[in-house]
Amino acid sequence: MAATRLDSDERRQTIVDAAVPLFARKGFAGTTTRELAEAAGISEALLFRHFPSKELLYREILQQVGCQGDPVLEQLATLPATTATLVGMVRFMVRRFVAGNEADRADLDPRLRLVLHSCLEDGDYARELFDAVFARVVPFFTASLDAAVQAGDIVPPPASRESGEGWRSNQFWFGHHVATMIAMAALPGRYCVPYAGRPEALVEEASRFILRGIGMSDAAIAAHTARNSGAGGLKTAAD
C-alpha cells in the first residue's frame, strides 16, 4: 500500500512535533539540521523547503508551545476580576505545574526543558515565551489583584511604592517562579529536591505561600480556598 503523502501544513506540523523533543533534550545550539530531518523522517532538503533556517523552525515551536490558543485563557476572559478569581488562578497555575496528570506532564516537560536550554544559551526563546505569557495572562492576574486590594483582601507590600505599577506584574512572576521551579525539580523523573508531602499537599502549601507573598490575608485565603477548591472555575482538559 502506497504511503500517504502529507500536504504542506501536515508536513510542517510533523517536523515541528519531531523537533520539540530534540530541542528540549539538546537545546537550539546542540541540535543539528541533520538530526531534525532524521527525526521527522525526511531529507534535509525537504526540511529546508518548509523551514529555510533552524531559527524559523524554533520560532514556529515558540508559537505553538506558548499560550496562544490555550483554552484556559478563554475561560479566564469570562471570569470576573475578584479575589476568588485571583485565588483560583494561583491554585490552577500551581496545580498545573506541580500535580498535573501524565498528559499535562508530557506537554509541560518539553516546554520547561526548552526554557532551561534557552536560558543557558542566548535567552531568546525564554524571553519571547515570557513576553507572550505577559501579554496574554498578566492582564487577567493584575485585574483580579487590583480587585482584591479594593476589597481589602490584599495589603500591597511596602516595596510596591518603589516599583510603582510594576509591583503587580512582579507578583505574578514571583508566583510563576515558585510553581515552575517545583516542576523543574521533577524533570529527572523524580524530585531532586526533598520536598515533604505528596504533590497535592505541595499544591496547597505553594499556593498559600504565593498568596501570602502577594499580601493576601489568611482569612481571605481560607475563605476562597474553602469556597472553591477547584481553581476558581478554571478547568483543564482532564477535568
Where are the regions a protein language model picked out?
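Helical hydrophobic small-molecule/effector-binding pocket
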Residues: 67, 83-127, 138-142, 179, ...
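Secondary-structure edge/capping motif, primarily at the C-terminal ends of alpha-helices
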Residues: 76, 119, 186-190
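Conserved phosphoryl-transfer catalytic core
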Residues: 68-72
